[in-house]
């Protein structure tokens, strides 16, 4: 419904069925029988995860730009129009994102959101030159061919099985790879406006925080290696060279992140004792993490 409500409809709609078993394919077909529109449905023979699906689209599509919308994304009506007009207005732009707000499983607004990214090319150049990771919410429009030229979504060099590390911070990896092209005057910016809402599920209290921290370290290391003209390391090689002390520090930071997430949902549900307990656990595990979240998220509450 969010796609059908877009003010700009001149785009090719490609739907990827990652071997779903919940009747999603029939739901899609039934929806478009009732709401006629161009669409292409690609069904994968096996479930390979988020990043593999994105890589398939990058290689399968023929359009200049791509914009992914996942199951828990709720684009506002002007998302496609505003992002497309922005990126197509300046040949220097590689990708354009926006701000994102949070909602619960019933569509009720939650505090916080994703308000990241540079709003000007000059700001982006400064960040890219300093070898900073490029954080931007994943519901963004980007140049498909240029993304592939820097490696696209990476699916090789990861251990088999779960967790699928390639599915963690996959957008961060792509934006950071594309940022290497700042030396050619290319840039990644955001439209400083909430154009998408993201559904956060109350029961999803756990997340692979340790895995995400490892991936961020991996992405940062490869950024520095690329800028020095060195070969990148696979995630398998990166993980193997970590020292025990370093892993313990990352585990404490992951514990802080998980505890703070649980505390938020417990307090919101009125479970005061459980919420306070997890809040103190988060602060004890890594006080710097708690302060950083307050600085970059809670202070943005309207």
Region annotations inferred by a language model:
Residues 44-61:
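Glycine-rich, basic loop-to-helix element that forms the pyrophosphate-binding segment
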Residues 22-30, 74, 78:
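Acidic helix N-cap motif at the loop->helix transition within catalytic regions
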Residues 120-217:
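Conserved nucleotide-sugar donor-binding catalytic segment
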Residues 180-188, 193-302:
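C-terminal subregions of glycosyltransferases and related glycan-biosynthesis enzymes
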Residues 78-111:
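Conserved donor NDP-sugar-binding/catalytic core segment of glycosyltransferases
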Residues 1-10:
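Short, acidic, metal-binding catalytic loop of nucleotide-sugar glycosyltransferases
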Residues 66:
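Short aromatic/hydrophobic "clamp" motif used to bind/position activated sugar donors
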